[in-house]
């Protein structure tokens, strides 16, 4: 891959899990970003322990040669919370803009079960036609707002949400304007669709409109247990559904090849939520960085 076009970041969720704060509560913010830099990454997404004042956060990152590339934002358009979502989005956007980020990764969280005890496959939510329309109109509006700051909005397809499957991604992308992008997540695509081929098909279909990439690997044996026992998303995370690239079932070489051939320009972010007491985050960050260097050449 071309290192002039693609930058490597890592998400703090491997150190401290915002959905389950007890996982990694002992890991400090400064330890987290220091280990990211030491592992060879130059970018990070934003976790709950990160200072939200750019005047505080930016110098701490710059000291380590790091920068912010994105931060999760939850939208609630399907639920009819348009005004609240847009108001909170504007504040979030201004923070990211001050940090120098160019993309805003969003997830439509109306009806989401990802943070609940519900079975991740059997109790997945679905949107009505009216809710789909609200989501599309809402994201089109967010894209216009982001453009005023020279930024772009992308939708993070995610397990346990109304935009998870290939069909749902297709419907979403067909309804929004061309200035609304997709955040492609290898792990969530594989987890949802169950195969390397289906995961790659999403990537290939939408590459011109993918502006942010999450690199997440999957352990097939844990997914099988999640299905057999009808476990929740968070139960799966604690058991090790996800891991870093090179440690699970996904072959990332075709992913990197597609991104390179299509001229992808932006960040690739290692995002692998595990229990840090079991999977040492620094050790796994080093493992991920080594694998990417070996397979992507950057």
Curated annotation (Swiss-Prot):
Protein name per UniProt: Inosose dehydratase
One MF term in the entry's GO annotations: manganese ion binding
Residue ranges the record marks as coiled coil: none
Organism field: Yersinia enterocolitica serotype O:8 / biotype 1B (strain NCTC 13174 / 8081)
Keyword line: Cobalt, Lyase, Manganese
Cofactor(s) for this UniProt protein: glutathione; Co(2+); Mn(2+)
Catalysis: reaction(s): scyllo-inosose = 3D-3,5/4-trihydroxycyclohexane-1,2-dione + H2O
Top-rank lineage group of the source organism: Bacteria
Record-stated family: Belongs to the IolE/MocC family.
Swiss-Prot/TrEMBL GO biological process terms: inositol catabolic process
SUPFAM superfamilies: Xylose isomerase-like
EC number per UniProt: 4.2.1.44
């Amino acid at each position: 891959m071309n290192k002039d076009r693609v930058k490597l970041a890592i998400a703090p969720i491997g150190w401290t899990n915002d959905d389950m704060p007890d996982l990694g509560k002992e890991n400090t913010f400064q330890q987290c970003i220091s280990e990211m830099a030491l592992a060879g990454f130059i970018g990070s997404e934003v976790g709950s322990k990160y200072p939200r004042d750019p005047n505080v956060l930016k110098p701490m990152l710059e000291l380590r040669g790091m920068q912010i590339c994105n931060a999760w934002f939850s939208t609630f358009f399907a639920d009819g919370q348009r005004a609240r979502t847009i108001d909170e989005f504007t504040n979030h956007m201004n923070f990211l803009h001050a940090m120098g980020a160019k993309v805003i990764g969003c997830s439509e969280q109306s009806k989401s079960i990802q943070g609940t005890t519900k079975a991740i496959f059997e109790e997945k939510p679905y949107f009505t036609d009216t809710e789909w329309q609200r989501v599309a109109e809402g994201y089109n509006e967010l894209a216009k707002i982001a453009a005023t700051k020279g930024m772009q909005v992308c939708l993070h397809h995610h397990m346990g949400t109304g935009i998870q499957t290939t069909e749902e991604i297709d419907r979403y992308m067909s309804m929004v304007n061309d200035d609304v992008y997709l955040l492609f997540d290898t792990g969530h695509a594989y987890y949802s669709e169950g195969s390397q081929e289906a995961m790659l098909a999403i990537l290939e279909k939408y590459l011109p409109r993918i502006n942010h990439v999450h690199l997440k690997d999957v352990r097939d044996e844990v997914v099988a247990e999640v299905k057999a026992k009808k476990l929740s998303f968070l139960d799966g995370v604690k058991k090790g559904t996800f891991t870093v690239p090179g440690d699970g079932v996904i072959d990332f070489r075709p992913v990197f090849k597609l991104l390179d051939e299509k001229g992808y320009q932006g960040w690739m972010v290692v995002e692998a939520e595990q229990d840090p007491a079991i999977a040492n985050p620094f050790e796994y960050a080093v493992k991920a960085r080594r694998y990417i260097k070996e397979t992507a050449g950057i």
